[in-house]
Amino acid sequence: MDENPEFAAIEQARDLVIDSIAETMDLYGITRSVGILYGTMYMRDEMTLDEMREELQMSKPSMSTGVKKLQDLNVVKKTFHRGIRKHTFVAEKDFFKFFTNFFPPKWEREVQVNVTAIEEAQADLQKVLCKEDLDEDIKNEALQLYDQLESSKAYYDWLKRLAESVQTGEIFKFIPVETK
């Protein structure tokens, strides 16, 4: 039986967007398979794990793991329907909400990891700089590194404030959403 060409064109358009969503998520450290899962859920309404597994031909444990990852990122929600035993899940369809849920935690983690490392490194450098009879070349190298680390703190302060402004929605005062 021949497939309806219009239906095939719709499916091709849907697959094109799913693939681009998966590729974009891969750029930000989310596996391609989880990106395909999100893209598929984005294109559909609520889905059960069985429906996801059937559509994507992946194992149920893989589906569960992928959905859990997307829930942890706060871009997929479990939905409740009285009288239905199977859980259904729905993807966040508003990309602005997706953005405000997805990026700030990553930025906050970057700030936390790097500021902690900088503070530890600067403490170690202070110990080196406090030594008497310190070789001038070593002192200069330690000072140069200390200053470089100190100047990088401005970036992490800015990134922390950016994360906060995205989470609170304040960023949209400066870069408003234009509806088309």
Swiss-Prot record:
InterPro entries: HTH-GbsR_regulator (IPR052362), MJ1563 (IPR026282), WH-like_DNA-bd_sf (IPR036388), WH_DNA-bd_sf (IPR036390). One of its GO terms (molecular function) is DNA binding. Keywords: DNA-binding, Repressor, Transcription, Transcription regulation. It comes from the Bacteria. Intracellular choline sensor. Binding to choline induces conformational changes and relieves the repressing effects of GbsR on expression. Residues 49-73 bind DNA. Belongs to the GbsR family. This is HTH-type transcriptional repressor GbsR. The gene is gbsR.
